[in-house]
UniProtKB/Swiss-Prot annotation:
UniProt-listed Gene3D superfamilies: Cytochrome Bc1 Complex, Chain C
Quaternary data: The cytochrome bc1 complex contains 11 subunits: 3 respiratory subunits (MT-CYB, CYC1 and UQCRFS1), 2 core proteins (UQCRC1 and UQCRC2) and 6 low-molecular weight proteins (UQCRH/QCR6, UQCRB/QCR7, UQCRQ/QCR8, UQCR10/QCR9, UQCR11/QCR10 and a cleavage product of UQCRFS1). This cytochrome bc1 complex then forms a dimer.
Gene: MT-CYB
Listed GO biological process terms: mitochondrial electron transport, ubiquinol to cytochrome c
PROSITE patterns documented for this protein: CYTB_CTER (PS51003), CYTB_NTER (PS51002)
Top-level taxon of the source organism: Eukaryota
Membrane-crossing residue ranges in chain numbering: 33-53, 77-98, 113-133, 178-198, 226-246, 288-308, 320-340, 347-367
Keyword Heme: yes
Main function: Component of the ubiquinol-cytochrome c reductase complex (complex III or cytochrome b-c1 complex) that is part of the mitochondrial respiratory chain. The b-c1 complex mediates electron transfer from ubiquinol to cytochrome c. Contributes to the generation of a proton gradient across the mitochondrial membrane that is then used for ATP synthesis.
Cofactor binding comment, as recorded: Binds 2 heme b groups non-covalently.
Protein name per UniProt: Cytochrome b
Organism of origin: Bradypus tridactylus
Residues holding a ubiquinone: 201
């Protein structure tokens, strides 16, 4: 008798995607991050749904509604901090996932890679809008600074900013539309995730060697599901430890002060996961130049497949490119650190040098290293 999961119209696609999926036998723990990101997304949707039941998207009551959630709602403080720290875990997994794809050359699956970049941009936009909702000092001023960047666009910039604000400054209309968009965005992300998986399952997964694995594949369940559960437990324990022991570790103390348009914080900064892009933005002297470099810092991922010059796909046997990959990783950590510092020497100089190194490594040094390695291999 045929198993129902292989014949039922609803269960058959799930079976092909999660149970009987032919998977390379040699993929490492770095391939766990996709399932971790899926778990993070589900957790964010569920906690966000419960928060939305009690949140008020009005400038006069938004801050107090967050206080009400934490004080009066059963386990409201847990849900709120799970949502905030869950976002941090989401970005941690997201950046590790991108790093793994860069290291092992998975960007050569163009459709999967490009939908992944679209996902990254959508998740970043969603997180930014979510950061505005508590209506604390950093929420208000962060939103003011970032949305104001659009005014650098020639001709239409000022009109565009006022259209996004729904007025001449950030006010009730802005908060309402940010809440609406923040609520709907995870479902758009969910649709993009399905597209991402659809393209991935068209080609099959890459592997650490970067070679075809058609001759050696195993079913996803039980082998890789067991491996994924270990990563899942580690992530859940880390998130719970962060939420229950140090809930405000990754937040900003200024957000415990209600938004005040008349009092500017001494140092405006976004959440830690945007700091690298924020450093690149403020290291550029002109406003329009800063906006362009900010956009390019993310969209540079789209052109990485075009800059691949090596004959080998993965970095596993390419020592020069490996060194450059870890230099890029260290550079991103430096950019993140500088983003949290005030705009004073020597931080401005370090930020400028790190920003230049970021683009140079991706666009010039890595393609050059690929050509050198081809010559060393006599290819």
């Amino acid at each position: 008798m045929t198993n129902i999961r292989k014949t039922h119209p609803l269960l058959k696609p799930i079976n092909h995607a999660l149970i009987d999926l032919p998977t390379p036998s040699n993929i490492s723990t770095w391939w766990n991050l996709g399932s971790l990101l899926g778990t993070c997304l589900i957790m964010q949707i569920l906690t966000g749904l419960f928060l939305a039941m009690h949140y008020s998207s009005d400038t006069t009551t938004a801050f107090s509604s967050i206080a009400h959630i934490c004080r009066d709602v059963n386990y409201g403080w847990t849900i709120r901090h799970l949502h905030a720290n869950g976002a941090s875990m989401f970005f941690m997994c997201l950046y590790l996932h991108i790093g793994r794809n860069l290291y092992y050359g998975s960007y050569s699956y163009l459709e999967t890679w490009n939908t992944g970049v679209m996902l990254l941009l959508t998740v970043m936009a969603t997180a930014f809008m979510g950061y505005v909702l508590p209506w604390g000092q950093m929420s208000f001023w962060g939103a003011t600074v970032i949305t104001n960047l659009l005014s650098a666009i020639p001709y239409i910039g000022t009109d565009l900013v006022e259209w996004i604000w729904g007025g001449f400054s950030i006010e009730k209309a802005t908060l309402t539309r940010f809440f609406t968009l923040h609520f709907i965005a995870p479902f758009i992300i969910l649709a993009l995730v399905l597209t991402h998986l659809l393209f991935l399952h068209e080609t099959g997964s890459n592997n650490p060697l970067g070679i075809s694995s058609n001759s050696d594949k195993i079913p996803f369940h039980p082998y890789h599901t067991i491996k994924d559960i270990l990563g899942l437990l580690i992530m859940i324990l880390t998130t719970l430890a962060l939420t229950l022991l140090h809930p405000d570790l990754l937040g900003d103390p200024n957000n415990y002060t209600p938004a005040n348009p008349l009092n500017t914080p001494p140092h405006i900064k976004p959440e830690w996961y945007f700091l690298f892009a924020y450093t690149i933005l403020r290291s550029t002297p002109s406003k329009l130049g800063g906006v362009l470099t900010l956009i390019c810092s993310i969209l540079v991922l789209v052109i990485i497949p075009m800059t691949h010059t090596a004959k080998q796909r993965s970095l596993t046997f390419r020592p020069i490119s490996q060194c450059l990959f870890w230099i890029l990783t260290a550079d991103l950590l430096i950019l993140t650190w500088i983003g949290g510092q005030p705009m004073d020497p020597p931080f401005t100089t370090i930020g400028l040098l790190a920003s230049i190194l970021y683009f140079t490594t991706i666009l010039i040094l890595t393609p050059t290293a690929g050509l050198i390695e081809n010559n060393l291999m006599k290819w």
